[in-house]
């Protein structure tokens, strides 16, 4: 089975004016598609290397390649669902309670998550996740597409901080992009992920 580019639940222009249609189209149809193709290519090369008895010579490079591209595919697949033209506002129910318990209030959570996004050095993601060992919400910075994040973390909310996610519209003013996405975060999706993670 190969990976495939998922369809979006909304049109490319549905998140305007917060995220421009041009960004969405390039981001989904080009950048995300490249990660899908890269993950499939890495899997194919790994399979051939196993069959040919050459896995020892290529495993390190291909494992890194697979992690990067599969990370890109996974991260974007979550990110698209985390966004909605009907998004914004604040979460409710169990997710809202967990956020208040862990971070003190929604506003403090928002400040923390935004700071994590803006504090990334280079490319990466801000991630709100559920830590299964601690049984709590945590905010982490994911570097590139796959690094510097806890293995026991289930991502609930992800914000792409690669330049391709914002530069055409917001140029180098990342803070304006981060401020804008709060208007399109899909709290229903985040809440569903939280419910599934805590079962």
Curated annotation (Swiss-Prot):
<keyword id="KW-0464">Manganese</keyword>
<feature type="binding site">
    <location>
        <position position="27"/>
    </location>
    <ligand>
        <name>Mn(2+)</name>
    </ligand>
</feature>
<dbReference type="InterPro" id="IPR050265">
    <property type="entry name" value="Fe/Mn_Superoxide_Dismutase"/>
</dbReference>
<dbReference type="Pfam" id="PF02777">
    <property type="entry name" value="Sod_Fe_C"/>
</dbReference>
<comment type="function">
    <text>Destroys superoxide anion radicals which are normally produced within the cells and which are toxic to biological systems.</text>
</comment>
<dbReference type="InterPro" id="IPR036314">
    <property type="entry name" value="SOD_C_sf"/>
</dbReference>
<dbReference type="Pfam" id="PF00081">
    <property type="entry name" value="Sod_Fe_N"/>
</dbReference>
<feature type="binding site">
    <location>
        <position position="164"/>
    </location>
    <ligand>
        <name>Mn(2+)</name>
    </ligand>
</feature>
<dbReference type="InterPro" id="IPR019833">
    <property type="entry name" value="Mn/Fe_SOD_BS"/>
</dbReference>
<protein>
    <recommendedName>
        <fullName>Superoxide dismutase [Mn]</fullName>
        <ecNumber>1.15.1.1</ecNumber>
    </recommendedName>
</protein>
<keyword id="KW-0560">Oxidoreductase</keyword>
<feature type="binding site">
    <location>
        <position position="160"/>
    </location>
    <ligand>
        <name>Mn(2+)</name>
    </ligand>
</feature>
<dbReference type="InterPro" id="IPR019832">
    <property type="entry name" value="Mn/Fe_SOD_C"/>
</dbReference>
<feature type="binding site">
    <location>
        <position position="76"/>
    </location>
    <ligand>
        <name>Mn(2+)</name>
    </ligand>
</feature>
<dbReference type="GO" id="GO:0046872">
    <property type="term" value="F:metal ion binding"/>
</dbReference>
<keyword id="KW-0479">Metal-binding</keyword>
<comment type="similarity">
    <text>Belongs to the iron/manganese superoxide dismutase family.</text>
</comment>
<dbReference type="InterPro" id="IPR001189">
    <property type="entry name" value="Mn/Fe_SOD"/>
</dbReference>
<dbReference type="InterPro" id="IPR036324">
    <property type="entry name" value="Mn/Fe_SOD_N_sf"/>
</dbReference>
<dbReference type="InterPro" id="IPR019831">
    <property type="entry name" value="Mn/Fe_SOD_N"/>
</dbReference>
<dbReference type="GO" id="GO:0004784">
    <property type="term" value="F:superoxide dismutase activity"/>
</dbReference>
